[in-house]
Amino acid sequence: MRSSTLQLVERSPVSAAFASVREFGFFAESTYKVSKQSYIKPEFAITNGDGLNVFGKDHGGLKYGGRIDYLPFGLFNNFGQYRQADLERELTPKFVIGANYSYNVGISDRRGSQSGTILYLDNQNNELLPDYLKYGIDFLFKYRGFSLLGEYVNASARVPSGITKYIRDNGSIDTFVL
């Protein structure tokens, strides 16, 4: 769900803390009917991992992500799955539960939204960047104007052991004292 479609004024704290924006890459999604009224919707992406449609120097590696949604009561009307409020006033209960996973190889920003704001170096001044893993689960229920939304996200980083220096925002290099 995009933060611009939230019912409340504030952007989702989860999106603000964990989401990268405007990824550039390959995206694939589909919808499969699995029974009389239930569907699954898988999504997969391989992106640059730095967000914000990076056109300059792209630090780090690729980001691999996937998501799967299960809709046991059928599809939402008029893409209602992607908006927080039940603007369509669903006449029958609608529910979606989804799980997501992403792995960013060599992240150069605290959440992968700008290239090069975090740069670490080894003794030979080669970039050594942490890998970033994120996974979560969420749900959305709507019925006759009522909507209920919940989500859980967990994130972690694997930091390489050879890091000895970092580049500050002003371009100067500092050495770690361990």
Language model segments and positions:
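Detector for outer-membrane/organellar transmembrane beta-barrel domains
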Residues: 59, 69-72, 76-178
